[in-house]
């Protein structure tokens, strides 16, 4: 068949997951490349970074739709490193996603209880 093997979409095959480089064109800027990730994580991370007042610029690009990686560019104020801001944004995203998961599971369980209650009345 004329398609890549499915394991190639998630297996790194010797590539580092994250590559971090300081940007020589701008002060206090960095370029981060994440392998085997797509717009989902890139958009969440860029938006989380933009909500931080220490961040002057945050944006990403996906070089090619068939290559599953993205390049994130971050520029911060002088007294803060881009690496620390990215780590803080990732931790904040994890916390936020955990809250969403807890809320979803609670609502799902309430929905299941209400469905079971309806089924019991008609049985």
Curated annotation (Swiss-Prot):
One of its GO terms (biological process) is transcription by RNA polymerase II. Keywords: DNA-directed RNA polymerase, Nucleus, Transcription. Coiled coil: none annotated. GO terms for molecular function: DNA binding; DNA-directed RNA polymerase activity; protein dimerization activity. The keyword DNA-binding does not apply. Belongs to the archaeal Rpo11/eukaryotic RPB11/RPC19 RNA polymerase subunit family. Component of the RNA polymerase II (Pol II) complex consisting of 12 subunits. This is DNA-directed RNA polymerase II subunit RPB11. It comes from Schizosaccharomyces pombe (strain 972 / ATCC 24843). The lineage of its organism: Eukaryota, Fungi, Dikarya, Ascomycota, Taphrinomycotina.
